[in-house]
Amino acid sequence: MDIKYKLASYRICSPEETFEKIQEALKKIETVEIKNIQHLDKVNIPVYYLKRRVVVDGKEGIAIHYGKGANDIQAKVSACMEAIERFSASYDKNKVKEKPDNPINVEDLILPQYADKNVKEWVEGIDIINNETIDVPADAVFYPTSGKLFRGNTNGLASGNNLDEAILHATLEIIERDAWSLADLARKIPTKINPEDAKNPLIHELIEKYEKAGVKIILKDLTSEFEIPVVAAISDDLSKNPLMLCVGVGCHLHPEIAILRALTEVAQSRASQLHGFRRDAKLREEFTSKIPYERLKRIHRKWFEFEGEINIADMPNNARYDLKKDLKFIKDKLSEFGFDKLIYVDLNKVGVDAVRVIIPKMEVYTIDRDRLSRRAFERVKKLYY
């Protein structure tokens, strides 16, 4: 299906249409409140949060989800879709089976040393590279999980206006985290991106908002061997508040969409930190409050330093504006470099397409320091040295 909305995002319909479609789903996930929190930060870039009721271990509680965007409606829909995909990823006993028919090699999931490899619960997925069903551990699908195989995470969870859109965006997130992990392992990240030649006016608009607020943005190129742009946006705040030393990373076939995602991710990181509701924000505040701003910058200096510069026009752009063609390009690239499976599990629970995508052998070090493959350092060497 053709991509129709491509200025602020890359979707088959506008965020206004999406918001209208998901109203029933928002009721089903027990949405309590959807609110704009951009007023908490000086950069004036839209960030929303969605609050919903949850039951954990028989006790009622609240879950918070954040959304980002270059405009108000996009940020609002982003928060809603994240909430829907998280609800959809909750444990579903109807999908679980004890005996796999075609089990994945669990070692390909890059396991921590503490992993219990005696997997007792499996879920059937579809491998769209080899066009076959394949069984994956339940811990790799649902969130939250038992954590016996590895710590639960949301990497590769996505929702969309249709199944292919959800698969595409989940896949791009996995490629993003893989590239980010390799950058984390590298001693230097040498290439800065010059955004002056950006054709998308929203890029200039967002950077101008940061500059007016006294926040310098540095864009770094993290693109790996797949030639799918991965961009990091690093914020250097003149207020020198350690909490505002944030990084946002975006990945997309179109470099300008990758840049937009990175820029809006920084805004979301800042606003959610100031909102301070979630446990991860509180832990980060506790940690960073003990370290002076300039020292934090020195610790993370590879993100600020650079040796060369490229223009956006120099970056690969393989966006086909067609979901099937986009996915085919990605599948071909993955296969070319030895990543021979792209698996998705359909998680649709509330009438909105949601998936968990799993790409075996992809790095997740940036979100789980206990999981690192031997191959990672070879890839870092080729990319950065």
From Swiss-Prot:
Pfam family, one: YcaO
InterPro entries: Methan_mark_1 (IPR017667), YcaO-like_dom (IPR003776)
Annotated disulfide bonds: none
Domain of life: Archaea
PROSITE patterns, alphabetized: YCAO (PS51664)
Domain YcaO positions: 67-385
Protein name per the record: Uncharacterized protein MJ1094
Species whose genome carries this gene: Methanocaldococcus jannaschii (strain ATCC 43067 / DSM 2661 / JAL-1 / JCM 10045 / NBRC 100440) (Methanococcus jannaschii)
